[in-house]
Amino acid sequence: MNSQGVPEPSADLLSLATAVRRAAVVLGQSSNQQRQQALMAMAASLEAHADRIVAANAEDLAQASADGLAPALVARLKLDAGKLAGAIDGVRQLSSLQDPLGARQLHRELADGLVLERVTVPLGVLGVIFEARPDAVIQIAALAIRSGNGAILKGGSEAKCTNQAVMQSLKEGLAGTSVSVDALDLLTTRAESLALLRLDGLVDLIIPRGSNELVRFIQDNTRIPVLGHADGVCHLYVDQEVDCTQALRIAIDSKTQYPAACNAIETLLVHEKIAPIFLKEAVPAFQEAGVCLRGDEASRDLGVEQVATSDDWSQEYLDLVLAVRVVKDFDEALEHIRMYGSRHTEAIATVNHDTAERFLRAVDSAGVYHNCSTRFADGFRYGFGAEVGISTQTLPPRGPVGLEGLVTYRYRLRGEGHVAADFSEGREQFSHRDLPTGTE
């Protein structure tokens, strides 16, 4: 084990990862139809074994209750029949989306008979580490197969029974298709998940989904590229020129529709000129919705009961708790977001078009919204079918990452005996003529 506590991979883990890698190489060369059929078979198998999966989840929930698991984690852990049915529908919808592979992004004649193209291809093998949410196994497995990638998944121990039941069903579905069952696998121990971080050369991308601590640890302890976000500290700024009724609906939805989500707001910023009017309606509305408000001095003077400390501004509650601050103007709101935001999703409520456009240009987050809930920051709601996670990094992919974020590209050059010397010595000339991209 190295100084940071990450062990060397065992022989069994190396064997598993090698098998996934080999299956991924074949999968990456499969046809769109083969991958679509694989997804439909996975969905059918999940449906056939729904009772087994829900029963396994009940075991996990009972153990979570006995262990005193935090309410936010319990909410993510639950996979009842309705939630499972929704996840299965998502797999089927994903199969109908446009094939992300083989898309020709560039088609160029470099010289007579020498043609270059840039075509989308799979990344290879995804290593996905997540906490609680067992439906993530379904989403990630489906996205991986659809995009031609293998996947090694490791869920939290709190969802062990559910994850195993789901993976068993997925593999049983793949067994009747041309896609190898080895393209997907599940790790079950903490030692394996740590050693996964050492599999550079076998794993091409690590995707962590979970707490700030989990993501930070992974980023600090692997040479494999990491896609993800460490925090979801999202804001709603209520401008001085605003439809208060509309803004309140947006605020309530952004906080309460699913408070355990990373795209729920954690801080409400209100312009001082509208604060007396807006908070008069907002405070009782939030209280009725069961939200605990913590505010600065100005907001407490307007009805917010609890005191917000400096720690609250950077806190991802994942619960029915909301920090409230009254700001003197637009610029102070921007400065607060720059200082405390996590570059996930920020929103403004305003009827002033110029103010909205300035906000949309100035805020450097993966998602920046005008007059709508932050809860729309989601791959399914964006029409991606599903997502492997949300990335807050500046380099792409950014925001909800669906199929397009799980592919890279390859340059292919076809010639007729061309050599570079002919061009450098003047016997041949480059034409650099763009051709229609069309299909591969």
Curated annotation (Swiss-Prot):
* Location(s) in or outside the cell: Cytoplasm
Q: State any single GO MF term.
A: glutamate-5-semialdehyde dehydrogenase activity
Q: Which UniProt keywords apply?
A: Amino-acid biosynthesis, Cytoplasm, NADP, Oxidoreductase, Proline biosynthesis
| Tree of life domain | Bacteria
Q: Which Gene3D superfamilies match?
A: Aldehyde Dehydrogenase, Chain A, domain 1, Aldehyde Dehydrogenase, Chain A, domain 2
> Which GO cellular component does the record give, naming just one?
cytoplasm
Q: In which pathway does it act?
A: Amino-acid biosynthesis; L-proline biosynthesis; L-glutamate 5-semialdehyde from L-glutamate: step 2/2
Q: What class of enzyme is it?
A: oxidoreductase
Is Aminoacyl-tRNA synthetase a UniProt keyword of this protein? no
Q: Where is the signal peptide?
A: none
Q: Which terms under GO biological process does the entry name?
A: L-proline biosynthetic process
What EC number(s) has UniProt assigned to this enzyme? 1.2.1.41
Reactions catalysed according to its record: L-glutamate 5-semialdehyde + phosphate + NADP(+) = L-glutamyl 5-phosphate + NADPH + H(+)
Its biological function? Catalyzes the NADPH-dependent reduction of L-glutamate 5-phosphate into L-glutamate 5-semialdehyde and phosphate. The product spontaneously undergoes cyclization to form 1-pyrroline-5-carboxylate.
Identify its protein family: Belongs to the gamma-glutamyl phosphate reductase family.
Name of the protein this chain belongs to: Gamma-glutamyl phosphate reductase
Query: Could you tell me which species this protein originates from?
Result: Synechococcus sp. (strain CC9311)
